[in-house]
Amino acid sequence: MGKVTGFMEFERVDETYEAPAKRLHHYKEFVAALTDEEAKVQGARCMDCGIPFCNNGCPVNNIIPDFNDLVFHSDWKNALDVLQSTNNFPEFTGRICPAPCEAACTLGINRAPVGIKSIEHAIIDKGWESGWVKPQPSKTKTGKKVAIVGGGPAGMAAAQQLARVGHDVTVFEKNDRVGGLLRYGIPDFKMEKWLIDRRVEQMQAEGVKFETGVFVGKEAIGAEVKNYSTKTVSPEQLMKDFDAVVITGGAEQPRDLPVPGRELSGVHFALEFLIPQNKENAGDFKNEIRATDRKSTRLNSSHLGISYAVFCLK
């Protein structure tokens, strides 16, 4: 615990946003990470609880009190090492994770919880800026080949971990670019796509191969699921060519809402709009669903719903 009375001395400080009048004119990120000093002060608010509920609240079990303490002591390199020991892609989660760790923070019972997500964001950004995040290729090879079906965040993380222990890993992705919903479901104003490309380059340097535009399977997928593949490979072929196959497909099949009016023109699932819109922003093609000069509503307050609303405004 860096500062015993830190949680009593310091208030929570959140990341700052660009003014709405400015952010309406571009699709880029508008959140500014904490400065080094701000992150240090926020790290001082951590109480290093005997039972760190934040760890259990985190889906990847980040060792949160440890990196908070290291940031407070300005030991950024070791803070990065602690963070990366449990999280392959902190620059993703530090931007778009809903932060259940903060909901589990004990300090949040009677004060504002520790700003864990913003500290994580600051750590990984400093790690990249300082040149500390580097490829970690395995020094030895196992001779085993592993296929990863699905190039979203789960597939990317599995591929990186398996490559680092010496397996030959190939990722099969049905879209023309890797990233899954990180790339096609999340707008640039939440997370710019060069962050994914940078990680892909690191993984390629670690020996991971990416086969894009490849659909794995025999059966047709639902009409609601976007499929831009140009090639098909059967599961049997993968089983023949690889020693193991890891299935990391995303949850793209939407759940319909059986209500009056659902059948009307202009009622769309979120990803029917978001995926083509992200591809339009990437310069691929024009999104056929247009919200220009139209009144729009959304039956959702989640990240997808908010993304849809902001795209419509822009």
Segments (PLM) and residue ranges:
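Residues forming the flavin
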Residues: M1-E37, Q42, E120-R298, S302, ...
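Short beta-strands and strand-loop turn motifs
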Residues: C49, N61, P98-P100, L181-Y184, ...
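Iron-sulfur (Fe-S) cluster-binding segments and ferredoxin-like electron-carrier domains
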Residues: K3-K28, F53-N78, P100-K126
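Catalytic cores of large soluble enzymes that bind and process phosphate-bearing ligands
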Residues: K28-T35, C46, P59, V71-F72, ...
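C-type cytochrome heme c attachment motif
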Residues: R45-D48, N56-G57, A103-A104, T170
